[in-house]
Amino acid sequence: MTFTLQLCDFLKSTLRAAQLYISVDKIYLIKLGASMSVLVAITGRDNTKLIAKLKELLPNEEIMQWPECKKLNNVEFVLAWNAPDDLWQQLPNLKAVSSFGAGVDSINMSLLPKEVDVVRIVDTELAQDMAEYVLGHVLAHKLRLKEYFVKQSQCNYKPKRAYKYNHVGILGFGELGKACAKKLTLNGFTVSAWSKTEKSDEQVHLYSQQQGLNEMLPTIDYLVCLLPLTKDTKGIINADLLAKLPAHACVINVARGEHLVEQDLIDALNSEMLRAATLDVFTQEPLPHDHPFWHNAKITITPHCAALSDLNSVTAQIAENINRLKSGLTLNNRVNRTKGY
């Protein structure tokens, strides 16, 4: 009886000193006390709606924005995208950093203490959006739609038979690569994929290492880049790689602009070593008005819109990780800092 009363008293005191956080199918018990200081360090966009949503989901936390924030010493969690390198040394209490996107290449992880966790956003809707974009542009190249757009501007009414090319090669076989491969396969395309490490898949012919890449490139009709950006993948789409593709091949880059050596692509197109390209990402964004890509009829340009993050999905993931951090739980979607993804 005495033990039961003591247990009840303990539970009462614990619940008085805690709050419940419910997230979809999970319930967290979080100790009340000083609020956690969260810094939004995202440059190049208006963060008003993002911060308002975070405050709605995390009413007990202190949500601040860089560079207006004056209490950097208190910051424990940072939501970052292209944050300045000199920010990290001003955060002595930093415990975790979340990228605002699927990749973490905008975070200079070499400047973070080793004990700081880095996480990223994983959004199934984003993966489906990417798959639809890739399928759409593969079909556009197959059906010669860009040629018809040009002919329309010239009042040129002349039909051409669609290409028979049907083999897509994907660089990168993570969540986005797998979603694209599935969508392409369901629509009748043959799909191969290359990744740094060996993987297996029943419907996709997988390659790995440099030898595997060399074997895959001559066999494909469309090359889709979905790699994470690391020191090893920067500039991977260069003159050497492009020379290994068939002359009728098309390149679709939806990963990062730095994967592509831009002048090498222009040279390959101008010399007819490559048929066409779709580019959604660029070394400099927005793409400068005087960039030669704008005036190349063989290049289709979109403004980094292949897969746009959904505000509700992103903020829910961020809020969940902040509450997991407060509860002492392992964060979701942690990044291997050695690999960079």
Enumerate the predicted regions with their spans.
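NAD(P)-binding Rossmann-fold cofactor-contacting core
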Residues: 187-203
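Rossmann-like adenosine-cofactor binding region
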Residues: 198-292
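N-terminal glycine-/charge-rich "phosphate-binding" loop or analogous flexible N-terminal tail
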Residues: 1-2, 7-76
